[in-house]
């Protein structure tokens, strides 16, 4: 369940300790995974909550967790992928695994808040939000044990 899905990348990020507060790198336009800029937004998730499955049709997401801890679960059902049918899960946090997760369009993803009271993610997307650009499914659409 921990293998990398084709075209999904993990990029270690730098934290710079500074008096009065640290600097957390997220992305530069010269970084791998940068495919353009559409919008950047923060999203919070409560401890133990899980956001439903979604798959973007054109958007590439670059996800960073600067606060708390989030488990991301990805499923590849792209028929032309070398990892068709593969699952991947990764927990990201500032303290234990500060990396950027790049998820291309066509990959199903859901995520769970692991830290109390809440966690925060930053999505640096190559497209602005469009309501019809993503497909959504309920959590029980794919058989995944969120308690494991």
What is the predicted function of each stretch?
Residues 101, 109-114:
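Short beta-strand His + acidic residue motifs that chelate non-heme Fe in jelly-roll/DSBH
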């Amino acid at each position: 369940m921990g293998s990398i899905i084709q075209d999904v990348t993990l990029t270690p990020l730098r934290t710079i300790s500074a008096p009065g507060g640290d600097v957390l790198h997220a992305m530069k336009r010269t970084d791998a995974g940068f495919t353009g800029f559409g919008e950047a937004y923060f999203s919070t998730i409560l401890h133990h909550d899980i956001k439903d499955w979604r798959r973007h049709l054109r958007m590439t997401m670059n996800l960073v967790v600067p606060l708390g801890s989030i488990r991301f679960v990805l499923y590849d059902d792209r028929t032309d992928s070398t990892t068709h049918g593969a699952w991947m899960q990764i927990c990201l946090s500032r303290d234990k695994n500060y990396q950027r997760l790049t998820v291309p369009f066509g990959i199903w993803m859901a995520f769970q808040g692991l830290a109390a009271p809440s966690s925060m993610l930053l999505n640096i997307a190559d497209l602005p939000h469009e309501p019809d650009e993503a497909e959504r499914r309920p959590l029980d659409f794919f058989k995944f044990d969120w308690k494991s």
